[in-house]
Amino acid sequence: MSYTTQQIIEKLRELKIVPVIALDNADDILPLADTLAKNGLSVAEITFRSEAAADAIRLLRANRPDFLIAAGTVLTAEQVVLAKSSGADFVVTPGLNPKIVKLCQDLNFPITPGVNNPMAIEIALEMGISAVKFFPAEASGGVKMIKALLGPYAQLQIMPTGGIGLHNIRDYLAIPNIVACGGSWFVEKKLIQSNNWDEIGRLVREVIDIIK
């Protein structure tokens, strides 16, 4: 099924945390998804940082139709089309590229573009986008910066990513406009490469316990 942006936001609010995943081997997505689901997370942002991304999205969609799937680190029109044809529910970009936003809108493909300053936010709002990624979160001022931006831009719904961990995730989630945080520390590539599903499961449980 296809979700509207608002439906995606509602699901993200329930989940609170989005695993940001980089894979070298697409086949690793299935045991990883099983591990995530068993520990309470039925969401994955699969990043286009490797050529395995589209195949991983395709495999996950075919085998775990219950998962909310984001295609992350999408930088080109070709990746947008590939993400959609592979079965992603929405696109996440590190920055705001109006051409990419317009393409997603033309394809009726929800997009959460990256912003970290007023200019990018105003471009997003002008294009009808109020659900945004705040990236790189900590390097861009973190919680303090988000609170400052929400003064004039109170309509934003935000998914911060970058530098978030157990030490600060609750500070982010305490802000009502934050729908979920993106994180990679509990799905590190080295843990996936070594098939260390037990450790990933432990780390997922750890973060779930923190954000309950």
From Swiss-Prot:
InterPro entries: Aldlse_KDPG_KHG, Aldolase_TIM, KDPG/KHG_AS_1, KDPG/KHG_AS_2. Its main location: cytoplasm. It catalyses: 2-dehydro-3-deoxy-6-phospho-D-gluconate = D-glyceraldehyde 3-phosphate + pyruvate. Homotrimer. It is found in: Cytoplasm. Pyruvate binds at residues 49, 73, 133. Involved in the degradation of glucose via the Entner-Doudoroff pathway. Catalyzes the reversible, stereospecific retro-aldol cleavage of 2-keto-3-deoxy-6-phosphogluconate (KDPG) to pyruvate and D-glyceraldehyde-3-phosphate. SUPFAM superfamilies: Aldolase. Pathway: Carbohydrate acid metabolism; 2-dehydro-3-deoxy-D-gluconate degradation; D-glyceraldehyde 3-phosphate and pyruvate from 2-dehydro-3-deoxy-D-gluconate: step 2/2. One of its GO terms (biological process) is Entner-Doudoroff pathway through 6-phosphogluconate. This is 2-dehydro-3-deoxy-phosphogluconate aldolase. One of its GO terms (cellular component) is cytoplasm. Pfam families: Aldolase. One of its GO terms (molecular function) is 2-dehydro-3-deoxy-phosphogluconate aldolase activity. Its EC number is 4.1.2.14. It comes from Haemophilus influenzae (strain ATCC 51907 / DSM 11121 / KW20 / Rd). The record marks 161 as: Plays a major role in determining the stereoselectivity. Belongs to the KHG/KDPG aldolase family. It is an enzyme of class 4 (lyase). It comes from the Bacteria. NCBIfam families: eda, PRK05718.1. Coiled coil: none annotated. Keywords: Carbohydrate metabolism, Cytoplasm, Lyase, Schiff base.
